[in-house]
Amino acid sequence: PSVPHGTGLMSSALTRRQWERALGFCERNGCRLMFALNCGPSARRPDGSWNPANAEALMAHTASLGGRVDIWELGNELNVFFFVHGLRRQVEVSQYTRDLVALRRLMERYSPGALLAGQGSAFWPVLGEPLGYFFGTTREMLRQAGGLLDAALWHYYPQQSRRCPFGSRR
């Protein structure tokens, strides 16, 4: 599938060859594959909704190869989009729920039997979700989208890297 390249942090793209090699590796070694699909700014329409075109191309290609993805995740750490992409790029939970519905439809078509995981949220000791009062999404996502999900993910960051702008133990 053709993938538009972003800029800066978002300038990389998985090639068809890399994807096929990952699928082959999992097949040969009996590994289960979980893959997070892009739902960041480069995969959004002007109205803010998720554009599933690249995800659909990837899923169709995977199905055509007889490949298998066991778990599809939509996005990663949406609760820090405000920091990474800017305030206007923060995805509302109601929109994310609609995006999950669109992904579930694609999964039914191309990847039946796969599980759907809600985006992994960043979570720090003491702080919880960064600026959680304003941008915390996990509880509301579970309230709105929990019935669509087979798994809800979160990323616990107990180590406090000096590079991390949200460090709580310095």
Predicted features, each with a name:
Residues 7, 15, 62, 97, ...:
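Residue-identity detector for threonine
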Residues 27-31, 38, 63-64, 105-112, ...:
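Sec-exported extracytoplasmic/periplasmic mature domains
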Residues 29-33, 66-70, 111-115, 147-150:
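Short, well-ordered coil/turn segments that N-cap beta-strands
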